[in-house]
């Protein structure tokens, strides 16, 4: 199976590969810079080559670049829209430089413009990007707090259908659960995946952010928990991981580092649940 974690690039992007190895992962995700500021990736060619070489040497991949948290594709504000498009262009270019196939992005919030206008804003912003042939932009499912979009499967389906680009989806289990799609039992997992397939299509699913949730289903609260120890729980996580539609998809953990448990513990947990289904 493909399972890994979101790794730091501190000291150079190639160090993310070493950190992934230490945690026992074989795929993963990075930020190219602090996600809390507007900043260029600024990855030099030597470091990029080292990242590519180490990833190939250790057979780690696919990798995903997660875009800045400041990006808001749904915004009605011209200045924020321009910054968001510029930031995304830099991310897809960095992905090509690093031979990373995916750039993940949240649609953002419509901040009062309304759902339809927000989705249309996101589509037109994405359509302004020049995406390298080797890179695919992934729309991440959202927990849906405030006016954020992407919390409903039909939001994702609409953007996929209307954009001029060939986009795909990253499903975050904690976000989906928070948005009201139950994953806490095997039956609920089957229902949710069936609804996703009917609305979006599992053939459009390129990556999963595998996270448990500290909050109940439908609360729209985005706070991640250790695998099997949150409100989704062991039964739901086990059923999700072992579902035939999910089995070939890269699973990227964004679980907490707390209570003596970090990425290594959570990766091991996922592997055990996959190897020893109930």
UniProtKB/Swiss-Prot annotation:
The gene is nfo. It catalyses: Endonucleolytic cleavage to 5'-phosphooligonucleotide end-products. The keyword Hydrolase applies. Its cofactor is Zn(2+). It comes from the Archaea. Zn(2+) 1 binds at residues 66, 106, 140. Zn(2+) 2 binds at residues 140, 172, 209, 254. GO terms for biological process: base-excision repair. Belongs to the AP endonuclease 2 family. This is Probable endonuclease 4. It is an enzyme of class 3 (hydrolase). It holds the Pfam family AP_endonuc_2. Its EC number is 3.1.21.2. NCBIfam families: nfo. Endonuclease IV plays a role in DNA repair. It cleaves phosphodiester bonds at apurinic or apyrimidinic (AP) sites, generating a 3'-hydroxyl group and a 5'-terminal sugar phosphate. The lineage of its organism: Archaea, Methanobacteriati, Methanobacteriota, Stenosarchaea group, Halobacteria. One of its GO terms (molecular function) is DNA-(apurinic or apyrimidinic site) endonuclease activity. Keywords: DNA damage, DNA repair, Endonuclease, Hydrolase, Metal-binding, Nuclease, Zinc. Binds 3 Zn(2+) ions. It comes from Haloquadratum walsbyi (strain DSM 16790 / HBSQ001). Zn(2+) 3 binds at residues 175, 222, 224.
